[in-house]
A protein has these predicted regions:
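A cross-kingdom feature strongest in bacterial/archaeal respiratory oxidoreductases
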Residues: 1-58, 87-412
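Non-catalytic, well-ordered alpha-helical segments in soluble enzyme domains
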Residues: 63-88
Length: 412
C-alpha cells in the first residue's frame, strides 16, 4: 500500500471489490475462470493445453488476457488470443478443433527454454536455529482451511465446513499445545483454557486437555500475540493436542475488512504479523491475555470414545479360548446378547443373521443367490478412513447434494 501511494494511477483487476480495490484508483471487473479462454504451458515448456470457458461472461467483465491485450493496444478477445498463440507457437500438424479435443499440443522448439538448476540454490539455504521457550514462542502462519488466503471468505459452504483437525467453523484461532496452555494457566489463573480436573479426565478418559465449553459453545479467551515491537494482533486461543510445546499456529485469510455479506465480521486478521524478515515464520513471540472471551463455533465437543472400545485387541492364546472376546469389552459388554434361534450358531453366522441385541427389523439377506431380489436394499457405502487426507470434499458434497442450508455461526 505504501508503494501504491507513489504511483500516478493504480488499477485493480479482481472479481470483487476488496481491500486492495479500496487503495487503488480504479477497479476492473475480472471474469471468472469458467468464463474465459486461456492457455496453460507445461513445467518443461514443451507442451500447451487449452482452457475453455464453461459459459459466456455473465457481467461486463474482462479476462486477464484481454486486459493485457488492451494495454498492448490490440483489443483482442481471449478466444482470438488463444487461437493466435496456437497457430504461431504449436505443432501445425494438429488443427485447433483437434487441439481442443485432445487437450494438449507440442510447442515449437524455439519457444522451449532451459529451466535453471535451482536444486543447488535450495541446498545452500541455511535454516535459522531457534529454540522456542515459554517466554519466547515460535509463530507459524499458514493458509486458512476455510478461506485459503482470503479469496474464499465469502463462500458459505467453505466457512461452515469444519476444519478437519480442530472442527472449528466460521472462525480462526491461535492454536497452542496443551503444555503451553498449562503454563499460561499457571501464569494467568483466570485464563480458563482447559476444563477443570475431574477424576475421569485426569485419567484421560473424557475431554483431556482440550477446551472449555459453556452451554454447548466453546468459550475461548482472547489474547494479544506480539512479535517484536511493531507486529501484534488479538485472537482467541484454541488448545490443539499434537502441536510442538512452544509453537503457535495462526492462519491468514480471515478477518477481512472488505468482503461480501457471508464473510463480513468473521475471523481474526493475522496479516499484521507478516513482514519481510519473517517469511511466515516468526520467533521471539509472547502471549498476553486481554481479559475478553470469544465464542467459537466448534462442532465437536468431545474427543474420546467414552467407554466405546472401537478398536479391540487381545493375544493369540486368549483368542483361541475366547473367540467372542470383543463382545466383553467396552460399554457394549453390559448389554446381554439376545441370539434367539441362532444361539448355537457360529459367531460368523450370527454376525450375518442376527445383530447383537436382537434388531427390531429383519436383517436383509445379502447372499449372492438373493442379490437380485426385488425390494432388497442395494445401496451401501464403504469408507477407508486410513486414506482420508482431511480435504472435506465429502462434507461439502453432502451439503450440496442434499440441499442443506448454510445456517451460520450461531446455529451450526
Amino acid at each position: 500500500s505504501d508503494l501504491l501511494k507513489d504511483t500516478v494511477s493504480s488499477f485493480r483487476l479482481g472479481s470483487a471489490i476488496d481491500e486492495t480495490s479500496q487503495i487503488c484508483d480504479y477497479h476492473i471487473g475480472q471474469s471468472h475462470f469458467l468464463e474465459c479462454w486461456d492457455m496453460g504451458v507445461s513445467w518443461h515448456e514443451d507442451t500447451c493445453s487449452p482452457v475453455q470457458p464453461l459459459l459466456a461472461p455473465l457481467f461486463d467483465t474482462c479476462s486477464d488476457l484481454e486486459v493485457l491485450s488492451s494495454l498492448l493496444k490490440e483489443n483482442n478477445n481471449s478466444h482470438d488470443i488463444v487461437l493466435d498463440f496456437f497457430e504461431n507457437f504449436s505443432d501445425i500438424s494438429v488443427n485447433f478443433e483437434d487441439f481442443l479435443k485432445l487437450g494438449t499440443a507440442k510447442l515449437v522448439p524455439s519457444l522451449v527454454n532451459d529451466l535453471p538448476n535451482v536444486d543447488q540454490a535450495l541446498l545452500r539455504i541455511e535454516p535459522k536455529e531457534f529454540t522456542p521457550t515459554e517466554n519466547s514462542l515460535e509463530v507459524l502462519l499458514t493458509p486458512d482451511f476455510h478461506t485459503w488466503d482470503g479469496q474464499f471468505s465469502n463462500n458459505g459452504w467453505m466457512m461452515e465446513c469444519p476444519q478437519p483437525i480442530t472442527k472449528l467453523t466460521w472462525d480462526n484461532a491461535l492454536l497452542i499445545s496443551p503444555v503451553l496452555a498449562k503454563k499460561l494457566e499457571q501464569k494467568y489463573p483466570k485464563l480458563e483454557l482447559l476444563p477443570k480436573a475431574t477424576m475421569l479426565n485426569e485419567t484421560g478418559q473424557i475431554a483431556p486437555d482440550t477446551a472449555v465449553f459453556q452451554d454447548g459453545k466453546q468459550k475461548a479467551p482472547i489474547v494479544t500475540l506480539k512479535v517484536g515491537d511493531h507486529h501484534e494482533y488479538n485472537a482467541p486461543l484454541y488448545v490443539q493436542p499434537g502441536l510442538a510445546d512452544y509453537t503457535v499456529v495462526s492462519t491468514i485469510g480471515q478477518g477481512r475488512s472488505r468482503v461480501g455479506r457471508v464473510g463480513s465480521g468473521t475471523g481474526f486478521n493475522s496479516c499484521s504479523l507478516l513482514h519481510t524478515d519473517s517469511n511466515r515464520i516468526s520467533t521471539g513471540a509472547t502471549i498476553e491475555p486481554t481479559g475478553d472471551f470469544h465464542i467459537l463455533a466448534n462442532v465437536q465437543e468431545h474427543w474420546s470414545m467414552e467407554g466405546r472400545a472401537i478398536v479391540r485387541e487381545t493375544n493369540a492364546k486368549y483368542y483361541a479360548e475366547h473367540e467372542d472376546f470383543a463382545h466383553h469389552m467396552g460399554a457394549e459388554s453390559h448389554s446381554p446378547p439376545m441370539w434367539g434361534k441362532d444361539q448355537d450358531a457360529s459367531i460368523a453366522e450370527k454376525a450375518t443373521t442376527t445383530p447383537r441385541g436382537n434388531s427390531a427389523y429383519e436383517h436383509p439377506d445379502h447372499t449372492y443367490e438373493h442379490s437380485e431380489t426385488f425390494g432388497l436394499h442395494q445401496w451401501g457405502m464403504s469408507i477407508d478412513l486410513n486414506q482420508c487426507t482431511g480435504c472435506s470434499a465429502c462434507v461439502v458434497a453432502c451439503q450440496s447434494e442434499n440441499n442443506i442450508p448454510v445456517v451460520g455461526k450461531d446455529q451450526v
